[in-house]
Each structure stands twice: as C-alpha cells, then as structure tokens.
C-alpha cells in the first residue's frame, strides 16, 4: 500500500466533480485525488509531498492525497463511519478546515456539516453521534487552515522521552486505529520504561513499539 509520495507536480487533472494531480516519483506518474484547497499552493513543476490513503478495488486502486498525516488520519476516521465513503470524506474536508470540521462534529453542528457535498441531515447526525466522543479527545485550534490536532489532556505524558510532534502523531494514529485513551497512555509509558526506548524524534519507532505492547499475548 502507498502511504506517502514526494515528487514533481506534472499536471492538474479534473474529471466530473473530482480533481487532483499527477505526481512524478522515480519515473512513475501517480494520479492522486485531492481537495481543491490543497491544490492552491502548488505550482506546476513544484516538488510536492502528500500523505496517501489508497483504496483498492477489483478494477484498480484510487489514491487520495493530503498535505499532512493528521488530515489523512482524520479522513480515515471519517470514512470509518457507515455510509461515509472516500468521496464524501474528501467533501467534508473540502467544506472547511480540519479544525472547523472537528468542532462541527463535536458540537453537532448539522448546518455546517450539511454544507459538504453529499452530506444530508441523516448523514450529519450519524457523524455527530458516532464520532463526537472519539473526536472529543482531540483539540483543534479554531479557524486554522493548518490544524494542530492533539489529544486534550496529555499533561501526564509530558515527561516521556518523545518530542511533541511525534507524540501528537502517535496519539492520533493509535486513536484512529481504535485504541482507547487509557490503552494509549499505558502503551506509551510501557515503551518509555522498556529496554529499548526509540529516539525522541522517531515517531515510527514509537508507533511500532506501542503496537507491539498493545498486541502482546497478555494484552
């Protein structure tokens, strides 16, 4: 599965209501669908980096791109809700910033949620009901187009030997995978006191170690 791409923007494409980029990486052109607000800062020939969610089907695969891992992971949370497919998930992220979207779901703001293409009242209600508690563990800076998503209460984790950005990404990823707050905290403390502690800036190392602890036979 493709999770991340860095390459040269070759061209912009548009088909129906969908649009995106062809990105050249090591001699291969990848067609990636993005929300239009992600496209605006990118000029032709520019080097771009996108985080990828890949959807595999019998007739091929589709790539959905995001400017950072936080938005990609939020997209994955959205499409985990029954009836929310990739196109609707992308439409939700198109309609407002990630921070505003999280706020709307937590507040049950149906008016804002239904502004997204393909989202009716029932779908908006389902989003609010199923994700309110899950997203309530995240904080988002209001009205930020570059949202900073993090778990609200992490005061007890400040002493861990991991830098703030990897810590934030680790919490978000584990939450996206369905782990509860308490499980995440226990895993991170266990990794921090283990025999082989990952480097403070090694987010992937912390993730692998946390998942090993969470999936240990006695867990």
UniProtKB/Swiss-Prot annotation:
Subcellular compartments: Cytoplasm
GO-annotated biological processes: DNA recombination; DNA repair
Signal peptide positions on this chain: none
Region (Domain II): 68-146
Gene Ontology annotations for the cellular component aspect, listed alphabetically: cytoplasm; Holliday junction helicase complex; Holliday junction resolvase complex
Pfam family, one: RuvA_C
Main localization, broad class: cytoplasm
InterPro entries listed in its UniProt record: DNA_helicase_Holl-junc_RuvA_I (IPR013849), Hlx-hairpin-Hlx_DNA-bd_motif (IPR003583), NA-bd_OB-fold (IPR012340), RuvA (IPR000085), RuvA_2-like (IPR010994), RuvA_C (IPR011114)
Molecular-function GO terms, alphabetical: ATP binding; four-way junction DNA binding; four-way junction helicase activity
Domain I: region residues: 1-67
Disulfide bonds: none
Gene3D superfamilies the record matches: 5' to 3' exonuclease, C-terminal subdomain, Nucleic acid-binding proteins
Residue span of region Flexible linker: 147-161
NCBIfam families: ruvA
Summary of the function given for this chain in its UniProt record: The RuvA-RuvB-RuvC complex processes Holliday junction (HJ) DNA during genetic recombination and DNA repair, while the RuvA-RuvB complex plays an important role in the rescue of blocked DNA replication forks via replication fork reversal (RFR). RuvA specifically binds to HJ cruciform DNA, conferring on it an open structure. The RuvB hexamer acts as an ATP-dependent pump, pulling dsDNA into and through the RuvAB complex. HJ branch migration allows RuvC to scan DNA until it finds its consensus sequence, where it cleaves and resolves the cruciform DNA.
Free-text note on domains in this protein's UniProt record: Has three domains with a flexible linker between the domains II and III and assumes an 'L' shape. Domain III is highly mobile and contacts RuvB.
Entry's family note: Belongs to the RuvA family.
Oligomer and partners: Homotetramer. Forms an RuvA(8)-RuvB(12)-Holliday junction (HJ) complex. HJ DNA is sandwiched between 2 RuvA tetramers; dsDNA enters through RuvA and exits via RuvB. An RuvB hexamer assembles on each DNA strand where it exits the tetramer. Each RuvB hexamer is contacted by two RuvA subunits (via domain III) on 2 adjacent RuvB subunits; this complex drives branch migration. In the full resolvosome a probable DNA-RuvA(4)-RuvB(12)-RuvC(2) complex forms which resolves the HJ.
HAMAP family on file: DNA_HJ_migration_RuvA
Protein name (database record): Holliday junction branch migration complex subunit RuvA
